[in-house]
Amino acid sequence: NKNIDEDNELYINELRDNDLEICKSKKIVTIDPGKNSLIYMLDEGKNKLRYSCCQRRRESLRKRCNKIILREKQKNQIIDEETKLSSYNCKSVNYNEFKEYIKEKTKLNDKVRGFYENELYRKLKWRTWIYGRKSEDKFLNNIEETYGKKEDLLLCYGNWSNNKQMKYIMPTKGVGLRRVIQKKFSVVLVDEF
């Protein structure tokens, strides 16, 4: 009995009357997504909650692990090897040029496979992922502590999404973070004009 868009996400203006009646009994919390403040939340009582990219980066140990990986890459001359590949065009429509690229890419993969299969590299990537999930779970618990039980909440999430990564800025979670929140809370999208 729900109207759903192509991404299987429900917009507030598409709710049916009986769904709207259910929503009226819930506490409404608005969410404004962004690049620096990944999530900025506000309810009717002006209670605020913020989840920033800096907080996520700090809690996930991402920057620290990336520095260690970069240092190891420099020590093992991985960056030099990977830079050689940049002289080839991977998007070429010329058969011979693309064939040369594939040959070089295969040689490079054979040379650097040992580094990427190294236990240190895999542990650092795993640690970043685990601590990232831990940070998200901590934030979800903060939502419940700040606004109440998940059964009593309706989160109105702005549908902003960044289609292109900004230059020199570390990538951040956008739609993925919304999906994490949707697994635990009732979420409807609000069209941001």
State where each predicted segment sits.
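Positively charged, helix-rich recognition surfaces that bind polyanionic ligands
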Residues: 1-193
